[in-house]
Amino acid sequence: NGNRVCPGVKGATNWMSQTFNPATGLLTLIALEQCDVFTSSSKEPEPKKSFSGGGARPTPQDVGQHFVRAFDPKTGKRVWEYPLTGAGEMWAGTVGTKTGVIFFGDDDGHAVAVDGKTGRNLWHYNVGEMLYASPITYAVDGKQYFAIASSTAIWTFGLFEPVKPVAVPKI
């Protein structure tokens, strides 16, 4: 019994970091498609004790699905989405670079980079545990890095170096 509400308590998007790229005009964020059944409680509040008045839980059939999604904030239209894997407990955010690469982590322990215009996977690395933190980028001596924390470590990766074309001699 109760009322099924979509999105649920953890659904849609929340406090996790979002990325806006002025060059593409896209807003990229983590989203959770999940509904909850909200119930009320007849229990009376008591002084100095927490009180919620009820609860909310997903049904066993509504396991939910996380996505990284890019939207055009002017139109509200979804431009692309990248499905995430794992248990659906991930609350990390996204971070973008000037070159249009979007970085994030997922429940299965993958640090991921996608093309910010298309959502195409560019790179991923399995760190072996959930990545709950929002990622950051920073530079040292002109080299840019991407970092994200897991429960036991801070994982740092150097960003891609552009490949320069090489002239091939004629034979």
Residue locations for each model-derived region?
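Extracytoplasmic/lumenal domain signature
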Residues: 1-4, 34-90, 95-171
